[in-house]
Amino acid sequence: MTEDVKADVPKKLSIQRRTKTTVSGTTTSGKSKAVQVEVRKKRTVKTDIAQQEEAKLKAQQEAEAKKIAEQKAAEEKARLEAEKAATKKEADEKSKAEKAKAETAKPAKSAVDSKAKFVDPEKEKRKAEEAELRRKAEEVARQKAEEQARRAAEEAKRYAEADDSDNESSSEDYSDYNLSSRYALEAEDEEDRRNENRGRGKNKVAKAKKGGRDDENSKNSKNERESNRKNQKDAKFGKGKNGKKGAALQQAFTKPAQVVKSDVVIGETITVAELANKMAVKATEIIKMMMKMGEMVTINQVIDQETAQLVAEELGHKVILRNENELEEAVLGDRDVNAEKVTRAPVVTIMGHVDHGKTSLLDYIRKAKVAAGEAGGITQHIGAYHVEMDDGKMITFLDTPGHAAFTSMRARGAKATDIVVLVVAADDGVMPQTIEAIQHAKAAGAPLVVAVNKIDKPEANPDRVEQELLQHDVISEKFGGDVQFVPVSAKKGTGVDDLLDAILLQSEVLELTAVKDGMASGVVIESYLDKGRGPVATILVQSGTLRKGDIVLCGFEYGRARAMRDENGKEVDEAGPSIPVELLGLSGVPAAGDEATVVRDEKKAREVALYRQGKFREVKLARQQKAKLENMFSNMSEGDVAELNVIVKADVQGSVEAIVQALNELSTNEVKVKVVGSGVGGITETDATLATASNAIIVGFNVRADATARRVIEAENIDLRYYSIIYELLNEIKAAMSGMLEPEFKQEIIGLAEVRDVFRHPKFGAIAGCMVTEGVVKRNNPIRVLRDNVVIFEGELESLRRFKDDVSEVRNGMECGIGVKNYNDVKVGDQIEVFEVVEVKRSI
């Protein structure tokens, strides 16, 4: 239908709508002036044809609707007439039957006249009932027909209105000034505006030269005409303030009746700004809410999970709490650890004071001479070994250093152990590290077995050891306690078998079990960086079986187990519970004490390791920032403090930790040791460059510098020192710190002179005639004047003469004349004390 209308629309006829003429005139001042006048012809639209077509279309639709309604009404009428005819036929049949019955009873009419008269009212009643039924049926049929006709008319009317609206919307685009499309009209108006602007641009210079009020009036009138024309057009198309938008131009979006409350995911910590962004509210709303709760916060302040949850729920949001460690928990939770537990070997840590025989005892047990390689009798790093007994039972030993600097290493060994063997020398008794080992064992909850060593010496006294240990709550079985005391001699092997039996007996009491066939987990005993093999970690397997090729997550590091070696350097393919192995293949050197866990997915293990590194970095930065803020004012008040910068490189991680901790403890209020760098492995060129930049000394503990590092060290004249015993390292660092201390100055009396007489001199004033009673009186040294042993003046000598000669010094027992500078109140009996200032070196 719409296509027909478009076809009937006459084609656009282009006419010249604008004509320009020039009007000449004179101004008020008498000057001639030419004004261009533009005459625009109004657009005419012939709408008769379109209106006729619309009226014709509407009439056709109404006629069709009327025809449909009439057809439906006729059908309903025919149906009603058929029902009426059927009812009438039934009534006629009944009346015929009655009539036939009456004919048969006619011969006896005379006899039954009275009876016939009695039956007539009954017939009349039936007829009346039949008539009433017919009337009701006709009424119902008529109402039904009227209802259907009304519905048909409404349906037809609705169809007609829908067609009208479609025609109006379709014809709207084609009903314009000249029956062209609306889009063509807009394009034409745009072209007109461009032409006008182009004309104005050409005449801009001329207009600027002419100026005057008439030009402004002309421009204003033109702007007004343009504005009026635009307003009329906008009003027609529903644009602008006065325009009414048609149904086709109105937006169908309806504003929601209430604010949508979305779910808010909250991590362990969140800032106020992030919380506001997630809840789609202003941050000021959250700040107001928290002020009502009694908390003063800023927009960038970090709030905890519970507070954020409370605020979000107060504002009507549903909160989803997210655990930031969920990836780590998921990775560590996806492990096969449900296998049956079996009995495992005990892990025994040997502790004790320096040189009490720990390594020698372990050496005898292992039947290997490793103690000869230990420098200075100190175990340099934790060693882990397992030995098999004659009856097939196995014991794993951890050997810890005895020096005071290795406190953290002993603490780690105690945590990973089941039984602590405390080695005490029978001739030396309880020492400081012995007490510390007892404390570590108690903190770890590990039972003690005391090995009283060196009983073969003549001065050995095991009973004294038991008495001394009683003071530290280590009660032997002899005194009613539960601690086994075993006298041994590591040198001769006496009592070693008894010690092993005591260890196995203690392990049976503990009932040690572990999963053997599941995925392995353990603890890092030691770690270091090997130049050829890369990062190496000594891992004590605590449960499960560690196999070659397993993916291991170890603290901040991860990797696949490329190779495993036992304590003898032999390659092994797997290691069960309580077995220590050296593991190769990690991404870096893990920290000693980190948990080592076998996981399924290497990619997820990498993600967990990176997450741990990031979290540790954040905590470290926060701690540093806090320390800076706390120490800012104290550092300002202290002034300059001498600093000794040190770079520490060692063979294993435990030694690095111990040395750094010991160096930090050496710091005093005047000299501080600052460890600018530390690490595991040899000394590299990077370390030398760092030492140059920070003016530090390099300390190598059981490591050496490579060739490139040595060249840089020699060129920059860096102080490089190698050590293999921690005593020497700490003593030399102390000496270096002592050299940085401010020296102390001490006054020493070198001579004493007694005033015997006083002379007056026109040049020097009062001259004291003195006798040197002690030491030497020197001309250039400072002096004090004492009267009745009280200092009344301190200064220097102006002259020192013996007879008439100036001398530099006068010795004991000689007379001299002394002139005191700027002091003339010298009296007989005074004492002149001569002293010198001596620099005294300090040490830490």
Curated annotation (Swiss-Prot):
Belongs to the TRAFAC class translation factor GTPase superfamily. Classic translation factor GTPase family. IF-2 subfamily. It is found in: Cytoplasm. Residues 343-513 form the tr-type G domain. Its main location: cytoplasm. Residues 377-381 are annotated as: G2. This is Translation initiation factor IF-2. Residues 352-359 are annotated as: G1. One of the essential components for the initiation of protein synthesis. Protects formylmethionyl-tRNA from spontaneous hydrolysis and promotes its binding to the 30S ribosomal subunits. Also involved in the hydrolysis of GTP during the formation of the 70S ribosomal complex. GTP binds at residues 352-359, 399-403, 453-456. It comes from the Bacteria. Keywords: Cytoplasm, GTP-binding, Initiation factor, Nucleotide-binding, Protein biosynthesis. One of its GO terms (cellular component) is cytosol. Residues 200-210 have a biased composition (Basic residues). Residues 1-35, 79-248 are annotated as: Disordered. Transmembrane segments: none annotated. Residues 399-402 are annotated as: G3. Coiled coil: none annotated. Residues 453-456 are annotated as: G4.
